[in-house]
Amino acid sequence: MTYYKLKIFLLIFAFSNLLACSANKSYELKGNTFGTIYYIFIEDDKSLNSNEIHSNIKYILNIIDNSASNYKNNSEISVLNKFKPDAFKTISSNLFNIINKAKIVGDMTNGYFDITLGDIKISKGFYLNKKGSKRNGRRNYTYKDIILSDKNLIKKTFPNMNIDLSGIAKGYAVDLIFNYLMSKNISNFVINIGGEIKTFSKNKDFINLAIDDPTNNQQYIEEVSLNNNSIATSGTYIDTVDFEGLEISHITNPKTQQNVSNLNLLVSVIHDECAI
């Protein structure tokens, strides 16, 4: 089987089943978002207005970026992180949904997925646009201390809590784009935002992927086939900084409150929802 390598978080694509339908028309949409790149492959037996589709996709991406980006000082999540009063605050439905899903994933992983680790990452030198001081001692809050209420209301029970959505925002955007493309009755497509991937095939064809070895990007360690579902991949080698002479990963263990220093780890999760 032939695999075509696409340099996005070291994932390898094979569109062998889709491309076999030579009578179909194919479209490639790509660009930059969330500090990474996105790539969308579409195939259909009818002509599509790819410019209109791409424009609507960019609109979706822009909405989520402005809501959930920790890199933008004026994004909705950045404004929320600066909000100190011990009171509820109204947020957009998208931000509410992202945080709600993050809390669900936190419960599913026994607390190992925790969106309140932003202050630790900032103190170690991640997010260069943010200023943070070196932390002393352990902090005593988790994602469970974020309270969500009706009508898109949120309350941080610890005002200095810094919510980091980088582990879920891309997947949430992938799911929104998936729903949009489904509404257009498109036959086959693959969505990839920085390694967060979701596929659809009207004929339920499998789309084959291979995942690179984090220790040697000339080799791959696993082959997977997707059939109308998602895969999200992250690794300790992807985003690192030098902290006090030690190279550390952006991935933080919420139990120890320490960044992972083993830079050869990678995990992929397959699920119906890319945000999960």
Which residues make up each language-model segment?
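Mature catalytic core of soluble alpha/beta enzymes
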Residues: 2-9, 19-276
